[in-house]
A protein has these predicted regions:
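Anionic group-transfer/hydrolysis microenvironments
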Residues: 22, 71, 118-120
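A glycine- and Lys/Arg-enriched "phosphate-lid" helix/loop adjacent to the NTP-binding pocket
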Residues: 82-168
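Short aromatic-enriched loop/helix-cap "lid" or pocket-rim segments at secondary-structure transitions
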Residues: 29-32, 78-81, 126-128
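Glycine-rich phosphate-binding loop used to anchor ATP phosphates in small-molecule kinases
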Residues: 43-109
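Charged, low-complexity C-terminal accessory regions
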Residues: 7, 155-183
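Walker A/P-loop
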Residues: 3-4
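Conserved substrate/cofactor phosphate-moiety recognition/catalytic segment
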Residues: 8, 12-51
Length: 183
């Protein structure tokens, strides 16, 4: 759907801090694939992403706008989905511990706005994703998990759905962000 590219481009466009998906660097450095991840890996993802986002939000370079590539709700979504897949190493018991940590971190976060990309089109293989979960059915199931968690955590009222092509989504976020800056 182009989430990471969108976040990077928005950060550069507004000269604002933006985060990357911390888990991807962790996985590259650890030489571990999605299906090999266990509970300790997901706890590291949660803490690593939270700390990265927090450091960028609190950075002296932040003039009030920050774009996050990922957070605890996204990590929890993947963990829940992977824990239900017998081809993945993550167990339902490990997921229960991940869920507690993810929910604690979600409560600490106070997002002003959350943009959610809905699944559409063909998933582009970036050679860093578990392609067994890249079909439209799987991506829609992941989206529904995220949506349910956004509702359950009280964050759904902050959500704007991005369902256009890349440029339409970019312009939608730019328009919203300019409105915030002009206040």
């Amino acid at each position: 759907e182009g989430k990471s590219t969108l976040v990077t481009d928005l950060g550069k466009y507004f000269n604002a801090p933006y985060s990357y998906e911390w888990a991807r660097d962790y996985m590259r450095e650890s030489c571990v694939s999605d299906w090999e991840l266990d509970g300790a890996d997901y706890i590291a993802f949660l803490e690593g992403q939270y700390n990265l986002n927090k450091s960028l939000i609190n950075s002296p370079a932040n003039n009030g706008i920050f774009f996050a590539d990922s957070d605890s709700m996204v990590t929890k979504m993947y963990a829940k989905y992977y824990s239900q897949d017998p081809s993945c190493d993550l167990t339902p018991e490990e997921y229960e511990k991940i869920e507690v940590t993810a929910d604690e971190l979600t409560r600490k976060c106070r997002w002003d706005k959350i943009f959610v990309l809905v699944p559409h089109g063909v998933f582009v293989d970036d050679h860093e994703r578990y392609m067994a979960h890249s079909g439209m059915k799987e991506r829609q199931e992941l989206y529904e998990l995220l949506k349910a968690d956004l509702i359950r955590s009280g964050n759904w009222d902050k959500v704007t759905i991005l369902d256009g092509d890349y440029y339409e989504n970019f312009l939608k976020v730019v328009e919203y962000t300019k409105g915030i800056i002009e206040r």
